[in-house]
């Protein structure tokens, strides 16, 4: 939010670049020493690097999710016809829900879900850019960042692009508290949107 509110972006970009470099070095060091540690966080990294080697343990959920995505094909098996969710994918209703969507509705269904998220994020960006004051703009920018980050992290976990994080898919994954907070955020965004007065010629 400070990045959005501040007129100069160069210092923040430099900090982000330095942070990314440090993160890469840390991940490389962890990858080297991961095999000698029993820490479950390190175990997530080793599972991410070699899920097949941990198929009986920590890699089971990731592999079953990937099998579900692969078995769905382009149009899927049909709504409600997933077999992987019936005990094969642990906690399929939570952070692995996208793999079930891919199995039942295929790549086409997953693309539709991503397009809907894209439209929501586009609308939030529009509201943030046209908000009548900085306070409203920052509120909606925070909501945008929260939802976008959750969607990106969830997709990357399901496709095994990053280690498992436990981040759920907004509005789709199981969880009443999550939905309550997301709906509160949508209410705040709509409140800011109501006060936008676009100039018409």
Name each model feature, range by range.
Residues 35-37, 93-97, 121-129, 155-161, ...:
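Transmembrane helix-loop junctions in multi-pass membrane proteins
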Residues 88, 100-103, 143-147, 175-178:
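Transmembrane helix-bundle signature of multi-pass membrane transporters/permeases
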Residues 107-151:
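Hydrophobic transmembrane alpha-helices and their immediate junctions
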Residues 1-9, 118-128, 189-196:
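Structural signal for the C-terminal ends of transmembrane alpha-helices
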Residues 15-110, 132-135:
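Hydrophobic, glycine- and aromatic-enriched re-entrant/interface helices and adjoining loop segments
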Residues 150-201:
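A juxtamembrane structural motif centered on a specific transmembrane helix
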Residues 12-17, 111-112, 139-140, 180:
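Hydrophobic alpha-helical transmembrane segments
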Residues 3-15, 134-138:
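Short loop segments and helix-boundary regions at transmembrane helix junctions
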């Amino acid at each position: 939010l400070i990045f959005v509110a501040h007129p100069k972006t160069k210092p923040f970009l430099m900090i982000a670049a330095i942070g990314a470099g440090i993160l890469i070095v840390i991940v490389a060091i962890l990858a080297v020493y991961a095999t000698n540690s029993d820490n479950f966080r390190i175990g997530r990294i080793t599972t991410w690097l070699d899920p097949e080697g941990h198929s009986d343990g920590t890699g089971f959920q990731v592999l079953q999710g990937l099998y579900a995505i692969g078995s769905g094909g382009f149009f899927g098996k049909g709504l409600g016809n997933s077999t992987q969710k019936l005990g094969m994918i642990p906690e399929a209703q939570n952070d692995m829900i996208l793999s079930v969507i891919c199995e039942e509705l295929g790549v086409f269904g997953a693309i539709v879900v991503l397009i809907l998220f894209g439209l929501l994020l586009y609308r939030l960006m529009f509201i943030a850019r046209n908000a009548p004051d900085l306070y409203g703009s920052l509120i909606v920018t925070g909501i945008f960042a929260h939802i976008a980050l959750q969607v990106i992290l969830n997709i990357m976990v399901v496709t095994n692009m990053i280690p498992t994080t436990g981040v759920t898919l907004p509005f789709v994954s199981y969880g009443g508290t999550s939905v309550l907070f997301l709906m509160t955020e949508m209410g705040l965004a709509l409140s800011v949107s109501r006060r936008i007065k676009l100039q018409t010629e």
